[in-house]
From Swiss-Prot:
GO terms for biological process: calcium-mediated signaling; chemotaxis; inflammatory response; phospholipase C-activating G protein-coupled receptor signaling pathway; positive regulation of angiogenesis; positive regulation of cytosolic calcium ion concentration; positive regulation of macrophage chemotaxis; positive regulation of neutrophil chemotaxis. Disulfide bonds join C95-C172. This is C3a anaphylatoxin chemotactic receptor. Belongs to the G-protein coupled receptor 1 family. The gene is C3AR1. It comes from Cavia porcellus.
Length: 475
């Protein structure tokens, strides 16, 4: 990987080691989630998969742990991506695969938690029916259907993911239209990549995938310069020649907006002004001849310094792609709202029934475990969906939009943190699982010290036999 100084010498980028506080917090959450979640989920997989008898409950939580374990495996890539300030060194295959795994885990986890809630509700309301129909085979079939539905819902992530290289810097992006990158996936740190947009350029929010801090990087090599920001892309030639490109907004998990400045380019058709000038060979040529009159029309007056800050967060009219709306609201409704309604309804019915029916202590603990798991899931995922919806409608260039983008790294990290909570909840609240873990650890120690234990065991057995024989003789 190239060093910061090497990148600066080759492209004119000025990288600095400082990170935004929100970025540091997000990396800390991701790191803690990986350190705790990977061994925790691995232990649950080992115990529940190999040491415990197959029941309906173990099937539910075993599949849930598989989803969390796979998500934990992807966290180092996310941490490195944040540390590299948006640079994507892993290639296009992982650009498609890693975000797909994250969304796959999101849908699988929420569907499995919903199934657990429904299962417990049926056990309380319909105990006789459950006794006749509730079995391990049915639970496995339901889990298989859940994985299949989750896979179908994450297909758009895999299909539309692409890598985009700009000045030797590869970025992981979503591309909804041929030849045009609708939004970039990750953000750049303003202090690291550059110092904002040139004064003559008016930048408007665009569409990009991963929402994050307002930042930009700028290169000034050759006859033209490129400024890629969290919200927009603008290509500029020296001497006031400026062309506004299709906007692109760095966002998170499918929240992005497309806003194009409706500027008349003095005779140039409006639709031609919306072409991707980064891929326009004529524009990149230094021999492009533009008349003085056209140059005057192409230049944009410099706005006041606080022009954008004074605008309302909802000032601009956003044009959101239809596919973006489908993806965003599908995740919100199918992956959050409907499951939450089902969970709340199930536990409400359980509470009402428990008022009239006496519940044994073990059932109380199992119910408490499920409720805590669901509550933590909601706490982890609610900020992610709330931030995503707000970013669709709030101008990212406003103070409110900038604040949302700054803290969205934290909301994404918090959503990933849900993967490490479940195994520790099992250990704290599940007595049977704690017992199995102790037995498994004892087995490891016995295998490591098999010779000594064998001798000790033989001695104990011999002593017990002699005592028994002596007792029988005395009688």
């Amino acid at each position: 990987m190239e060093s910061s100084s090497a990148e600066t010498n080759s492209t004119g980028l000025h990288l600095e080691p400082q990170y935004q506080p929100e970025t540091i917090l997000a990396m800390a959450i991701l790191g803690l989630t990986f350190v705790l979640g990977l061994p925790g989920n691995g232990l649950v997989l080992w115990v529940a998969g190999l040491k415990m008898r197959r029941t309906v409950n173990t099937v539910w939580f075993l599949h849930l742990t598989v989803a969390d374990f796979v998500c934990c495996l992807s966290l180092p890539f996310s941490m490195a991506h944040l540390a590299l300030r948006g640079y994507w060194p892993y290639g296009e295959i992982l650009c498609k695969f890693i975000p797909t795994v994250i969304i796959f885990n999101m849908f699988a986890s929420v569907f499995l938690l919903t199934a657990i809630s429904l299962d417990r509700c049926l056990m309380v309301l319909k105990p006789i029916w459950c006794q006749n129909h509730r079995n391990v085979r049915t639970a496995c079939i339901i889990c298989g259907c859940i994985w299949l539905v989750a896979f179908v819902l994450c297909i758009p992530v895999f299909v539309y993911r692409e890598t985009f290289t700009l000045e030797n810097h590869t970025i992981c992006t979503y591309n909804f239209s041929p030849g045009s990158f609708d939004y970039l996936d990750y953000a750049y740190d303003r202090d690291a990549w550059g110092y904002g947009t040139p004064d003559p350029i008016v930048q408007l929010p665009g569409e990009m995938e991963h929402r994050s801090d307002p930042s930009s990087f700028q290169t000034q090599d050759g006859p033209w310069s490129v400024t890629t920001t969290l919200y927009s892309q603008t290509s500029q030639r020296p001497s006031e020649d400026s062309f506004h490109m299709d906007s692109a907004k760095l966002s998170g998990q499918g929240k992005y907006v497309d806003v194009v400045l409706p500027t008349n380019l003095c005779g140039l058709p409006m639709e031609e002004n919306r072409t991707n000038t980064l891929h326009n060979a004529a524009f990149l040529s230094s021999d492009l001849d533009v008349s003085n009159a056209t140059q005057k029309c192409l230049s944009t007056p410099e706005p006041p310094q606080d022009f954008w800050d004074d605008l309302s967060p909802f000032t601009h009219e956003y044009r959101t792609p239809r596919l973006l709306k489908v993806i965003t609201f599908t995740r919100l409704v199918v992956g959050f709202l409907l499951p939450m309604i089902i969970m709340v309804a199930c536990y409400t019915l359980i509470i009402f029934r428990m008022r009239r029916v006496r519940v044994v202590k073990s059932w109380n603990k199992a119910l408490h475990l499920a409720m805590v798991v669901v509550t933590i899931f909601l706490i982890c995922w609610a900020p992610y969906h709330v931030f995503g919806v707000l970013i669709l409608f709030i101008n990212p260039e406003s103070r409110v939009g900038a604040a949302l983008l700054s803290w969205d790294h934290v909301s994404i990290a918090l959503a990933s943190a849900n993967s490490c909570f479940n195994p520790f909840l099992y250990a704290l609240l599940g007595r049977d699982l704690r017992k199995r873990v102790r037995q498994s650890m004892k087995g490891i120690l016995e295998a490591a010290f098999s010779e000594d234990i064998s001798k000790s065991t033989s001695f104990i057995q011999a002593k017990a036999f002699s005592e028994k024989h002596s007792l029988s003789t005395n009688v």
